[in-house]
């Protein structure tokens, strides 16, 4: 991140909170031109700092769970992570340190759909065990 300066970090923070923030609003807050904001964002995309623009959403009656995954050390964790992210219902996959190698966030419309997603994760070669917890509230 050597080419990322303080203004870039401020832009990233603004976009993290609301990816739809108009460039004019960002420019006004940072006291720079709209063209400068546009160039900086293009640079951040080209550098791979900004991976994608997305939305956070919450549907009524939707359930989220955190699923921690312990993996077989003989199978590279990234191989397993790449398979997990393709499973229906998996929203995020994080490789972590500690007792578990992977932490995932899964979404479903009911407990059965969450359970199916967890079963799909457990069925992958290299997954030794999982530990799941239901999310009660999400704060943005």
Curated annotation (Swiss-Prot):
Keywords: Activator, Cytoplasm, DNA-binding, Transcription, Transcription regulation. It is found in: Cytoplasm. Residues 23-42 bind DNA. One of its GO terms (cellular component) is cytoplasm. The keyword Transcription applies. The keyword Cytoplasm applies. CDD domains: HTH_ARSR. One of its GO terms (molecular function) is sequence-specific DNA binding. Coiled coil: none annotated. Residues 4-67 form the HTH asnC-type domain. One of its GO terms (biological process) is lysine biosynthetic process via aminoadipic acid. Pathway: Amino-acid biosynthesis; L-lysine biosynthesis via AAA pathway [regulation]. In the absence or at low concentrations of lysine, activates the biosynthesis of this amino acid via the alpha-aminoadipate (AAA) pathway. NCBIfam families: trans_reg_LysM (NF040947). Homotetramer. This is HTH-type transcriptional regulator LysM. It comes from Sulfurisphaera tokodaii (strain DSM 16993 / JCM 10545 / NBRC 100140 / 7). The gene is lysM.
